[in-house]
A protein has these predicted regions:
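Intrinsically disordered, low-complexity and often Lys/Arg-enriched segments
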Residues: 1-6, 73-74
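Long, charge-rich, low-complexity alpha-helical segments
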Residues: 28-74
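A short, structured beta-strand/loop element
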Residues: 4-44
Length: 74
């Protein structure tokens, strides 16, 4: 399994949506993915609504978030 770093998937740029974390190459906030999942919507619906985000990027971003959280709890 290839390791993905945050900058490969999620970026922050003050010129893009005021610097909130977005998927690289898009204006789609990472928070939008979390909101969809929190609301009980499937990943497939998020990807359908935001076609500029690939399945691979969404899964990689979730893996990064999981790793970060688990790392903080250790």
């Amino acid at each position: 399994m290839q390791t993905v770093s945050e900058g490969q998937v999620i970026v922050r740029d003050p010129e893009v949506l005021g610097g909130i974390p977005v998927f690289r190459g898009t204006r789609v906030p990472f928070q939008a993915l979390l909101d969809y999942l929190e609301g009980g919507q499937p990943l497939s619906e998020f990807l359908e609504d935001f076609p500029t985000v690939s399945h691979e990027a969404a899964v990689a971003a979730l893996e990064l978030a999981k790793s970060s959280l688990v790392g903080q709890l250790r």
